[in-house]
């Protein structure tokens, strides 16, 4: 089974985690699958799929794939 999320370096976003379903950075998936970073004055603050380093992108990609697997198994 192919994993839904992958990470790569792009000219526009730098290191980013992408969703294979949309071929775009995984903004929606970060908001839906991962818990919010904190409940702010203007709502939930979620994780940004655009990362500074390859390591951060790899870790976020692993978290998203794990969360997606748990959701699809339910």
Task: Describe the residue ranges of each PLM region.
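Short N-terminal "domain-start" leader segments
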Residues: 1-42, 47, 52-54, 58-74
